[in-house]
From Swiss-Prot:
Residue ranges, annotated region (Disordered): 161-187
InterPro entries documented for this protein: DUF4533 (IPR027895)
Biased composition (Basic and acidic residues): 172-187
Annotated organism of origin: Mus musculus
Listed name of the protein: Uncharacterized protein C12orf60 homolog
Amino acid sequence: MSSESEKDKERLIQAAKLFFFHIRDLVSFINRFVELFNLTMKTQILPMNLNEESCIKDFFEQMIRNFKEMQLMVDGKHKQMQKEPLCSKVLTAMTSAVEKCATIAPHHTAEDMLRNIQTSGAALVLKTSHVLVNLETSLSLLMQFPIMGLRLSDLYREETKEQSDATSDATTSEKNKSPECPKATTEETLRKLQDVLSPENAHTPVEAAADELEQFVKSMEITLQVLQKSIKTMEGDIFVLTQVQGK
């Protein structure tokens, strides 16, 4: 087998491994985003669960559903804000504050007002930045890649502590057989990736599959960057509010 073919196989395996960890990062970031969204918008959207035996398509569909649900909530809050003139909002807030002062400690009243401002502000930022729509669109485009029918475990399997301990305690005869397992797993991964990613009648199917998966990974990295920036922005807004409430 040529060195170029071996190089393409290694590229494909490495791209699959990177994709595996990008999916884990994506789920982790989205759960953090959902946590911050729930905190600022006073909602109860459920976090995602990562099951490596599920189809990759299932992850993306769940992520898209989450963003659609958040977008509906933002649209609803923004529509509510649009109906009421700004001066009316201020008057309502001040009247409510005066009424509460008679029975509630002033700092509690201020916190309530700040929470309302935070929720309205978060809705406005999420609406005008189009971040939810952009993330939903990015994930929808990624779903067009042919890899969606595979399971996450088809791409890469992490060795658990139990597996590592079992390997280290293996007998000499078992150790002599052990290289066959990783090789078999690698060959199976290559076959599955090649089947779904290589165009029909491709002259170099492994190279074509590696090119396709590397492009997918690059596209995912852009989505991860958008999520990270959005999370940092939301964390900054919450930090400012916390500082104000602490004074």
